[in-house]
Amino acid sequence: MAEQIDSLKHENRRVEVVIPAYNEEKRIGRTLDALTVLPEVDAIIVVFEGNDRTPEIARQYQKVRVLKAERRLGKGGAIKKGIEEARAVEKIAIMDADLPVSPENFRQLLRIDDADLIIVKRNFANITKTRLMLHKGFKLLTKLFFPSLMWVGDFQAGVKVMRADKAKEVLNELIINDLLIDVNLIYAFKRRGYKIREVELPYVHDEANSKISKKLLKVIILMFLSLIKLRVYYSPFKGILSWKLYKKAEQRIIKALS
């Protein structure tokens, strides 16, 4: 991972936003336009993967630091790298590149001070029936695997806000590199006894540019396998994940589904 831009001052950085960006040239500009003007946001880390103009666009913004991955990290890997590199002393936020909530509602989340992790329950403005059905099915399956998360109304919303110190503390538990990172993160906070608060907000789903919709079946299979992996990690059988045979099989599956 090579750091491309870091012209920002290190001190007094209260809030940083981490944006995982895989070929997001069509959407990243609008998102950075909205976030860089917010007085609460001191810096933005764009973790870039791919081969489009995303870094070139991001470099135009003074608050933005671009981290360019030398290999494919996946959304989870990009988020972990962003948290690791963040220097905020108060809060670290995670935001999808399509700006799924309004700047006003994002500011509302940043003002909440009585929780270690703030997650969003999506009130969808536009979503297909198929995606909604899959969303509900995934939520049910996740709760069967992790009963202590039965109260969670939504795992996959593309915006979360965390206390910076707590985010750093759970880093070594974040083992998922794909889209299941949200469940991994929430459960890591929950099992440590950190306070989690869920806020319902209007949510805009960008179906036209959604990478998930274009390979939905592969994503479903990969997330199901990652759910099993996460459950095994938090079980007496955790050692299986370090077996060479398991690692080799995992790499082959990921390659086949990518």
List PLM regions with ranges:
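Short, well-formed alpha-helical segments that are part of the catalytic scaffolds
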Residues: 23-37
